[in-house]
Amino acid sequence: MKTLLLLIPLVLTACGTLTGIPAHGGGKRFAVEQELVAASSRAAVKEMDLSALKGRKAALYVSVMGDQGSGNISGGRYSIDALIRGGYHNNPDSATRYSYPAYDTTATTKSDALSGVTTSTSLLNAPAAALTKNNGRKGERSAGLSVNGTGDYRNETLLANPRDVSFLTNLIQTVFYLRGIEVVPPEYADTDVFVTVDVFGTVRSRTELHLYNAETLKAQTKLEYFAVDRDSRKLLIAPKTAAYESQYQEQYALWMGPYSVGKTVKASDRLMVDFSDITPYGDTTAQNRPDFKQNNGKNPDVGNEVIRRRKGG
């Protein structure tokens, strides 16, 4: 029971998880990060339900949240050296005796038949000698334990790769093709498909307990998509979300190891806010219906030539 009571404060005193910025060596993604980003994005895109677009020609519009930024994190890996280091000092009693010498001063006064003699004794204002005696033994004892990690955090700057957006767009086009849905230029499409990528990035965290430590890197992809028929302006696919995260984790004991390395891919929590519950206003008419074509605000209606091309005429 005593051992358990001692272990509980030892384990809980330094509980905490520090979340930092993923490091890019030389501005390039390291292999594990590439694997995680690809896995989460592939899983999210694969989850998209495109059955309502079977046999249609779709124009695809992908919008990705910007991921450029920078941050600093400094400090080394946790060490328990300072937590249990102790010292004991034993100094003997010390006594010092000072010797102050005395000196006499004599003054003689004479006046005719009268005379007088005055004698005084004084001490010097500084000791002429000092004697120090120590009583007892002097000793010093110390004990400590130092466990260092395999490396330190350094200041890092997050360098965004603009090709990530192109990679994600190509993944979406690949899934469309494999599902049998043709992706065409906007002028030949009968369906507009909008994909908004809200989350597409990585997060690194470190868990530090006295006995257990872990390094965790996660990649998350969260997107929302919907599809609109160009002729009728009706939703073929109501706004839906797809969210997945992949994780790489190394587990240590006293920062020795790792004794366990794991990779997982699983469904993530959905968007904090989505558009699945939005409905048109009751007074919306066909004349002021929204236009879903990009850069088409001045000419919301589709021309006859475009309609003829869609029908293959």
UniProtKB/Swiss-Prot annotation:
Transmembrane segments: none
N-palmitoyl cysteine-type lipidated residues: 15
Compartment annotation: Cell outer membrane
Keyword terms: Cell adhesion, Cell outer membrane, Lipoprotein, Membrane, Palmitate, Signal, Virulence
Predominant location: membrane
Keyword Amino-acid biosynthesis part of the UniProt annotation: no
Any one of the GO CC terms: cell outer membrane
Signal sequence, renumbered to the chain: 1-14
GO biological process: one example: cell adhesion
Lipid attachment, kind S-diacylglycerol cysteine: 15
Top-level taxon: Bacteria
Disulfide bonds: none
Compositional bias of kind Polar residues: 282-298
UniProt membrane topology term: Lipid-anchor
Stated family: Belongs to the MafA family.
Protein name as catalogued: Adhesin MafA 2/3
Gene that this polypeptide is encoded by: mafA2
